Amino acid sequence: MTIWCFPLLQYRYKLCIMVIGTGKITLNTDHCHSLKEKRKILKSILARVKNTYNVSIAEIDLNDLHRIAAIGFAFVGNDRRAINSKIDKMLEFIESLSLAHIIEAQVEIITI
């Protein structure tokens, strides 16, 4: 793989910035009585969030527990405020679905 480096002083273009918003959401699924019911609810949440916010999102942990779930997500863009806004709206959307309650949300925004 070839990486091209150009001196920035020769060009009057703005330096390109990539902003990554990533995190882990822990959900309370107390009303679920089986893993099958939990998977059904999570599948619904993940599909709705993907379709609404165009985000990479998946169940990442706590697969064997039916009363709690952990999902990870990632947004990529070029504006820190826009990514932060999308994350806030996504969290509100998940809570508004009333399928599971957010216990904890760990969010990190990285600028490269």
Name what the model sees in each region.
Residues I3-I17:
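Short, Lys/Arg-enriched N-terminal segments with co-localized hydrophobic residues
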Residues G21-I25, I71, A105:
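Hydrophobic residues positioned within well-ordered beta-strands of beta-sheet architectures
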Residues K38:
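C-terminal binding/interaction regions
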Residues I20, A58-N78, I110-T111:
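Short, charge-patterned binding micro-sites
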Residues G21-D30, L35:
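Short glycine-/aliphatic-rich beta-strand segments at the starts of folded cytosolic domains
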Residues G77-I112:
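C-terminal structural segments of small proteins and small subunits
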Residues N28-C32, F75-R80:
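Structural beta->alpha junctions
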Residues Y53-I60, H101-V107:
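Short beta-strand elements
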